[in-house]
Amino acid sequence: MNINLPRSKRIMCYGIETSKDWLVNYVKTHRDAYDIPICRDSVFNIQYAIDILQIQTGIQQLTTRLGYAIGDIPANEVPILAICTNLKSSFRNRPSQAQVDHLKQILGAGEPKSWLLDPDDFN
């Protein structure tokens, strides 16, 4: 039996909480190894950090998002490293557990968790 239920308008993300400062500092400590130019703009440094983490972990769809913890009232936006979402193309290309474990090791983080994302970010 094929049941097609309407997709929820909520976009969920599997990811790890981070901070802008952590990402900027990560670039500073890995700049030479990846031949990254010195840059004072935090937006560029955050993207450089994502690029380095993608290379190190093999998680090509790794990105930053603002997420909401499920059950967090009032809902506060938290910066996260998004590993994959519940969107079909993202979920289909989700990373292996070994890749996620490597990312956790780099971040010194616990298990990734589910976050709610703002659907307007995907329009």
Where would I find each of the regions flagged by the language model?
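Acidic (Asp/Glu-rich) sequence patches and key acidic residues
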Residues: 1-109, 121-123
